[in-house]
């Protein structure tokens, strides 16, 4: 199978892994569940996953609906499409990092499915910050531009997941991230290049000012690097939860940067 066929398989597997969107079974024939190569398609999968919310946002803004209502709808659709996968990772990470006395305690807490105080606060802040950021920026763009801004942030945040995953060792020998394998260096480079280039193109087409683009890039870089350092200090590496938390934190940072500068 050539590059196009392999990439289509990787896109389908990435979308299937990151969301509740059903994918054709033919893309999973002989698939062992590892994502070492498939992570190169994470940014593209982010575009597909965010497309429903972007389309609804475009329609609502064209109808001149309240930007706050539109922002709530956008975030709600994103959570439904992903099954709140990334929010779950953020909540578990917040509980583990906040309540764990040491590495072992933090990892044990992160495996607990119950929601603690730190998780509740983190999720409230995540939804609140994203809704407020969307409410701030959506009316500043044309309806199509608003959709492109949503897609750009989604693309960047999925590239951030690959960067975090590839830059840290597994914090535990079992779990989703460990069983899915370590991202291949070539796949990581492709994901970062694709994610950055496509996000910048979408921001350009949305007519985001140069200051906004620079601020979004700085927010992207600072969040991924800063959170990776925190994860390394707290648990000695990455897990599926910290990968999901990276998506949430990066999207919040990028949207916040746009809200402050557009």
Swiss-Prot record:
Its cofactor is Mg(2+). Keywords: Cell inner membrane, Cell membrane, Cobalamin biosynthesis, Magnesium, Membrane, Transferase, Transmembrane, Transmembrane helix. It catalyses: alpha-ribazole + adenosylcob(III)inamide-GDP = adenosylcob(III)alamin + GMP + H(+); alpha-ribazole 5'-phosphate + adenosylcob(III)inamide-GDP = adenosylcob(III)alamin 5'-phosphate + GMP + H(+). Its EC number is 2.7.8.26. GO terms for biological process: cobalamin biosynthetic process. One of its GO terms (cellular component) is plasma membrane. Its main location: membrane. Joins adenosylcobinamide-GDP and alpha-ribazole to generate adenosylcobalamin (Ado-cobalamin). Also synthesizes adenosylcobalamin 5'-phosphate from adenosylcobinamide-GDP and alpha-ribazole 5'-phosphate. This is Adenosylcobinamide-GDP ribazoletransferase. The lineage of its organism: Bacteria, Pseudomonadati, Pseudomonadota, Alphaproteobacteria, Hyphomicrobiales. The gene is cobV.
